[in-house]
Amino acid sequence: MEVDVAPGTYDLLAWCGSTDKGSFRIPESASRKELTCTLMRESGTDGTGHIREDHDRLYHGYLPNQTFGDTEGIYTYVVPLVKNTNNVRVVLQQTSGERLDEKRFSFRITAENGRMDWDNQLLPDEPVTYHAWHKQSATAGTALPDLPDAVTSVNAVIAELTTARLMVRDKSATVRSETGTNPPQLQPEELPEERKMRLTVRDNDTGKTVLSIPLVDYALLVKGEYCVPSWS
């Protein structure tokens, strides 16, 4: 993007991404502390928020202390971006061979991650429930271990959900946003179970919970070992 600015030293702050769905609200301000970002949501009667559709992709970037000189010309700076939105795809597999109906199951992610400060740290927020915006039944063939020439069918329900940041809310977020301090981000295991971001699958026929797992913990289990190379 191109901007015309007077000579001086600036902190470059970027909230960017798609805007087709109007999923996020960012106020217009010249003060970075007012440039917060809020995920738009449907308000529930119990004081919680609900997201039932796929939402815009969001990125955040911050590059402090960049100088635009007195000499007229073009100054180019690259602002590194962090992706704030994540697509979660769940495959619920039936081992008995029985066909599964996607309408039988509900998938949701619950988190307190719908408000972000100017520096991309999470602000205090109500619990937000992200519902699956796509579900379908599917079948895949698989070979039997003892009979390599035999193939059996595996039935499953596939669900897709989109959530904001995959991180836990800092216990000191209220203090941090008021004082400007920045304590270390707490790890998921330091929080009580009810505060963790959770993925829950429910059987609508029986009303029972099929599974409920701390999503951040499980995401870390499958995190790749790839590191961005340092070019010299």
Where are these regions (language model features)?
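Extended, compositionally biased alpha-helical segments that mediate assembly or anchoring
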Residues: 215-232
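Tryptophan-paired
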Residues: 1-28, 101-220
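A short, Gly/Thr-enriched small/hydrophobic beta-strand-prone motif that recurs across taxa
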Residues: 80-95
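N-terminal onset of structured domains
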Residues: 97-99
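Short, low-hydrophobicity acidic/polar segments
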Residues: 1-84
